[in-house]
Amino acid sequence: MSSSNLSSILRNSRIAQVPKPKGPLFSPDKKYVPTHQLIENKASTMHRQEWGMKSSIPSRSKSRYLIFDELDTQQRLTSFEAIGQYQWNRIRIQELGVVPERATAGNSFQTSADANAPSNPLFSGFSSRLSARTPLSSFFGLTSKSDAKQWKAAEKKVAALRPAFKKWLQDHHPHLIIHKDQMDPADFRKRAVEFITEIATRSSGAGGSWKVVGNGGLTYGLKGRLQQSPLGIKQNTVVEGRILQTNGMEKSVAAAGFVGNGMLGTNLRKVDYAMGDLVRTARFPFEVKQARLLENGRLLMDMSLIEPKNTARKYGYGAKENKNRTYIFQRGAVNERKISSEESAQQAEELLNILTNFEN
């Protein structure tokens, strides 16, 4: 075997490959999940020139993290970019100690647009595909822009579930099978929705066992677990944040390494009028209420402004709890028309007719 053939075999082998990238190293597109191989550029690694690649990196590159898509090239110089990308988001979440919640059928924060977005390869599955507002539409991948071909595919899926639905009725509600002609159609369709919801929360494989859902490597903590600190048990996560924009009712807030837009109401209006543009120099406490991980990997956080009692009385806010929230997210939201209740009801009616029709 010649050296060229051996080199070709080695280059094409699994031990000499990195995951195939889904795009260029540097792209302005939104990145919610890792897209390239990432290495940590420590001081000791830079000194020894060891990164696991077959060529060295220029010494002037001092970035902490590097991404690349090849171990070696014909020019003996690997293309790389000094971008931390997803790594910095993971570090920020771990520093906060917040456990992200997955978007599931029981959560009300998942919209139809997020439910039908491309799934995150780190944790895709039926367990996070169901929307609480439009369960049938989101389960079968139907949106306001679905064409006739997608509808045909959804109808085939419903028809394929008919034998399983009949067996489920025999096990859980046998009276519906025995007295089918005397049952109310509304009750019958209600059981069909219950059946769809049950199978949507289970894995499509593994013999129907519950699917283990992770947090994409953002954290390994458990929700509800007590956190220890030098001052005792830590029950809430409070971080400092700044108000970046005060024009109009929309406020831009920077907190915990994330920047987002949200409604803060009129509680800070007097502070805005008094400080003007200098409000950016003031730091306000924000409590991290919830971190939510959507199906496409987008991270959405609920931050609540904390107002001291003396400050509230000083500005005439009263003793009521401030319930205003601002939504802190990784990147901009995608504007898409949501499915109305009438459209969802019409779609559910057609799909349930197919599922409950045992005669065909």
UniProtKB/Swiss-Prot annotation:
Keyword rRNA-binding assigned: no
Record has Iron as a keyword: no
GO cellular component assignments: mitochondrial small ribosomal subunit
Source organism superkingdom: Eukaryota
InterPro entries per UniProt: Rbsml_bS1m-like
Keywords attached to this entry: Mitochondrion, Ribonucleoprotein, Ribosomal protein
Family statement: Belongs to the bacterial ribosomal protein bS1 family.
Compartment annotation: Mitochondrion
Pfam families the record matches: Mit_ribos_Mrp51
Function: Involved in mitochondrial genome encoded proteins translation.
Region described as Disordered: 1-31
Complex and partners: Component of the mitochondrial small ribosomal subunit.
Gene Ontology BP, a term: mitochondrial translational initiation
GO molecular function: structural constituent of ribosome
Low complexity composition bias: residue spans: 1-15
Protein's name in the database: Small ribosomal subunit protein bS1m
